[in-house]
Design a protein with these regions (language model features):
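Extracytoplasmic gate region of multi-pass secondary transporters
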Residues: 38-39, 231-287, 342-346, 350, ...
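Helix-breaking motifs and short loop linkers at transmembrane-helix boundaries and internal kinks
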Residues: 50, 82, 103-109, 137, ...
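Cytoplasmic helix-loop-helix junction between adjacent transmembrane helices
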Residues: 113-153
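Conserved MFS/SLC helix-loop-helix module at the cytosolic interface between two early adjacent transmembrane helices
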Residues: 69-108
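Residue-level signature of mid-helix packing/kink "hotspots" within the transmembrane helices
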Residues: 36, 64-72, 156-157, 277-281, ...
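C-terminal ends and interior cores of transmembrane alpha-helices
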Residues: 92-105, 310-326
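Extracellular/periplasmic helix-loop-helix junction of adjacent transmembrane segments
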Residues: 39-69
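Helix-loop-helix hairpin linking two adjacent transmembrane segments in secondary transporters
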Residues: 148-201
Length: 424
């Protein structure tokens, strides 16, 4: 037995792994500033370019199409070249594509830029999950995932703080250029800091032993064909298919809902959106913390993850009635709790691949699930565009949002009733 990494009994476990999470967190902040800018500018861009609800739905659709295709590929790429270069390449692609929005002169130009953004951003979560699988033991992964996933909410908070001011002062083109160029600062830091744990000079023996405390995974190449025969692959992927579209809806249509229902505009979106995504942060970190805490108390992975997911699914149900809220702040509370529930649910669903699959397969399973999630988003975006054009109300859309998480949990439980390690 190799004991070279074993610490002395009195040696304190280091915390360098949390530096890695902080970098992932920062990347997700940038990711969501880039992703959400279009949703915040929808009313202005629709007016300037004469977009219909169907045109905007197409814009979202093609972003998700490229995201779906690329997500599958990124999972495999992360397994092949690792999180350092895989994440770095993905980041560079999405930042360049974000800046390219400034050159769009019509719907086709925006679609082209959005598709480039989708290709790059699709690598964000497979890379993040891969990095967490490399740097954390199973009992800490949901919490670590929740922390870096909380960066998406901070990005969603930063966007209404920054983008309206830039847009009103310098025009919408500069909103894309300024945020894109500023975000590029992250890339060299990531490439300088990130290494696999055993290759990292700043990692102590105690922390390395802590990271590697789980039984070693068998080292073998695992193809998609084999993964697609596993029920756990479909548990994760169908869960993503059902819940990812709800988050896409919040991200791309929430400013439009607040504008149409409560008369908000680019100058007044800020406080309600910030409140919603602050609540989302609580859910992201809280969902990961709850399941990790239950496991520390002796609960099984299966019981801890699914109990947390059930709590989150129930908290999402009231969003069905968001359209009926009598004032904007009641709507903000209802929607904010639902977005928090989504993030808590997601933090635990995201860990399913690393909980049950060998590390060599994690990126590929995450890629398959991400592709299914984006495909679900494509279907839902078309549905949203159709509903808004034909009916003009968000009520049917919120009804779907309120029920999706309970259905997703049922599917996950039926396909992976025990969340036991998969035999490859």
């Amino acid at each position: 037995m190799d004991v070279s990494a074993a610490p002395a009994p009195s040696e304190k476990i280091g915390r360098y792994r949390w530096v890695i999470v902080s970098l992932l967190f920062a990347a997700m902040v940038i990711n969501y500033v880039d992703r959400q800018t279009i949703g915040l500018l929808k009313p202005n861009l629709s007016k300037e370019f004469g977009w219909s609800e169907g045109d905007y739905a197409d814009l979202v659709f093609y972003f998700q199409l490229s995201y779906a295709i690329a997500y599958l590929a990124w999972g495999k790429i992360m397994d092949k070249i690792g999180a350092r270069w895989g994440f770095g390449i993905a980041f560079a692609i999405w930042q360049i594509a974000h800046i390219a929005h400034a050159g769009a002169r019509g719907l086709s130009g925006f679609i082209f830029a959005r598709m480039g953004l989708g290709v790059g951003e699709a690598g964000g979560f497979p890379g993040g999950i891969k990095a967490v699988a490399e740097w954390f033991p199973k009992k800490e992964r949901a919490f670590a995932t929740g922390i870096f996933n909380a960066g998406t909410n901070i990005g969603a908070i930063v966007t209404p703080l920054v983008v309206p001011g830039i847009t009103l002062a310098f025009g919408w083109q500069m909103a894309f250029i300024v945020t894109g160029v500023a975000g590029l600062v992250w890339l060299p830091i990531w490439l300088l800091v990130y290494r696999r744990p055993r290759e990292h000079k700043k990692l102590g023996a105690a922390e390395l032993a802590h990271i590697e405390q789980d039984p070693a995974d068998p080292v073998e190449k695992i193809g998609w064909a084999k993964l697609l025969t596993k029920r756990e692959t479909w548990a994760y992927s169908l869960g993503k298919f059902l819940i990812d579209p709800i988050w896409w809806m919040f991200l791309f249509w929430l400013p439009d809902f607040l504008g149409k229902r409560y008369g908000l505009d680019l100058k007044t979106f800020g406080p309600p959106l910030i409140a919603i995504y602050l609540l989302s942060d609580v859910g992201s970190v809280g969902g990961g913390w709850l399941s990790s805490n239950l496991m520390k108390r002796g609960w099984s992975i299966n019981a801890a993850r699914k109990t947390t997911m059930l709590v989150c699914a129930l908290l999402a149900v009231p969003v069905m009635f968001a359209s009926f809220a009598s004032n904007v702040w009641l709507a903000v509370l209802i929607i904010g709790v639902a977005t928090a529930a989504h993030q808590g649910f997601s933090a635990n669903l995201y860990t399913l691949p690393s909980d049950v699959f060998p590390r060599a397969a994690v990126g590929s399973v995450v890629g398959i699930g991400g592709m299914l999630g984006a495909l679900g988003g494509m279907v839902f975006s078309k549905y949203i565009g159709k509903v808004l054009e034909d009916i003009g109300t968000y009520t049917p859309i919120f009804v779907v949002a309120g029920t999706a998480y309970l259905v997703a949990l049922l599917v996950v439980h039926l396909l992976s009733p025990k969340m036991e390690p998969v035999k490859i």
